[in-house]
Amino acid sequence: MSMIKTLALSTLAAGLMVGADCVYPQSGTGMREPLAKKERMSFDTPKSMKAEHDELHANLERLTQSGGRTGEAAKSVAKVLDPHFVNENAYALPPLGLVVPLSQGKFECYMSAVLKMTDKLEGEMPTMLSEHKDIAAALKKLKDAATAEKKSAGVEFAEHLAAHAQTEEEITYPTALLIGLYVKSKATQCAR
């Protein structure tokens, strides 16, 4: 993850911990102007994260077709990675679509719907982390096979995906959970 992404997520986290009201002054009741209807319809995974996942999928697909031990090892990675990505796309990444509005001090009651996803992520964290271990084991086999066959693309992919998983564990998942906690704290305004 780039330093800019890390800094942006860290800034959001700090703002959420002390309260966005302190970071971004607001007037009135603390509620913001309604967002455009399109923005209220769903929680979208940030484009940069979607692009990274798409790139990982494309690279893995190429590796599965590379033949030899590397191709077979890549198929093993795909077998454990694909269902994991489905779950991430269902409930771990979409909450991050609220990073920008929340970091600007904007909160709307409809955002409370994200709690279904963040609660699901919280409950599934042990499984998600266990899947990361399975993915890491498959990546080791891929890296070993690619090294033996002198297929640098396999080695690079294994290293990139391992770093990606570490970023998810250290930044992505905790940020999604933090968004859930923040939205939960703000949702009390909606019940009044």
Feature annotation, model-predicted:
Residues S2-A8, M17-R192:
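Small-residue-biased structural context
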